[in-house]
Regions:
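The catalytic Tyr-X3-Lys active-site helix of short-chain dehydrogenase/reductase
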Residues: 81, 88-97, 101
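A short, exposed helix-loop element centered on a Lys and neighboring polar residues
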Residues: 55-56
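Residue(s) in the substrate-gating loop at a strand-loop-helix junction
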Residues: 75
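Substrate-binding pocket helix/loop in short-chain dehydrogenase/reductase
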Residues: 31-32, 39-41
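Conserved NAD(P)H cofactor-binding loop of Rossmann-fold oxidoreductase domains
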Residues: 23-28
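Conserved amphipathic alpha-helix within the SDR
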Residues: 1-15
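SDR active-site lid
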Residues: 111-206
Length: 239
């Protein structure tokens, strides 16, 4: 990260940074109880430490600028740790950390660097390659046991894969990743426009997508119901 910082400063011939976008993220590490510790910690490291280390590396250069803004990407899973009733622990824990860190910086910057703003971005379903890239980053060939667990999760999410072979599950994973990107209600270009417009207005809390706004409203309106199995199904039908 420090090498990246040095290269950015050198390429732009400056020691000051005005905008820092922390946007790295992968999935994986679904179950804390039964999942791989290595996969869990890799997902958490990318999603949380990617934000922390980059902010730590660039903070002095942001503070030394006349005006600065830190933009951290959390998720709807940073305030609602659910994914269709299936385990989603590492990603959600990391995105909660990003949201908490960003909110804590508001007072810190107001006191110690009032010319620097911070925003936390909470996207809903955006058409990106995160599902596909997660597999590339986590690496390794899936075992039949891995595929069986994935199959069980797909069934819980309502996918008709009961009679699928391991090879068919692999193909379904690929198709799901493509569908996640191509069938999203909000494209990455639309998300970028929403985020940049909100940053210009110096909003600290940026919800991206109608689904994100709806889920935020539902969770705030009925927090005790947010993790009931029926909550997820009812809300999906309403979006």
């Amino acid at each position: 990260v420090n090498q990246f910082k040095d290269e950015v400063l050198a390429q732009h011939d400056t020691d000051k940074i005005n905008l820092l976008f922390n946007n790295a993220g992968i999935g994986g590490g679904g179950s804390f109880v039964e999942g791989s510790r290595e996969e869990w910690e890799k997902c958490f490291a990318v999603c949380w430490y990617g934000v922390y280390y980059c902010t730590r590396a660039f903070i002095d250069h942001i503070v030394s600028s006349e005006e600065g803004h830190i933009i951290n990407t959390s998720s709807i899973n940073g305030f609602w740790a659910s994914l269709g009733g299936t385990p989603h622990t590492s990603y959600s824990a990391a995105k909660f950390a990003v949201k908490g860190f960003s909110e804590a910086l508001i007072d810190d910057l107001r006191v110690n660097a009032p010319h620097v703003n911070v925003s936390v971005v909470m996207p809903g379903h955006i058409g990106t390659s995160i599902a596909e890239n997660t597999g590339k980053i986590l690496g390794g060939k899936r075992t039949e046991e891995d595929l069986e667990k994935i199959k069980e999760n797909m069934i819980k999410m309502g996918l008709p894969v009961h009679n699928f072979s391991p090879e068919q599950i692999e193909q379904q994973i690929k198709e799901n990743a493509e569908a996640f990107k191509n069938n999203a209600p909000t494209t990455s270009a639309q998300a970028a426009e929403i985020i940049l417009s909100a940053v210009k207005r110096k909003e600290w809390r940026i919800l991206v997508g109608d689904d994100a706004k709806a889920i935020d409203e539902w969770v705030r309106g009925a927090p005790e119901d947010a993790y009931n199995i029926s909550f997820n199904g009812e809300r999906r039908e309403d979006i």
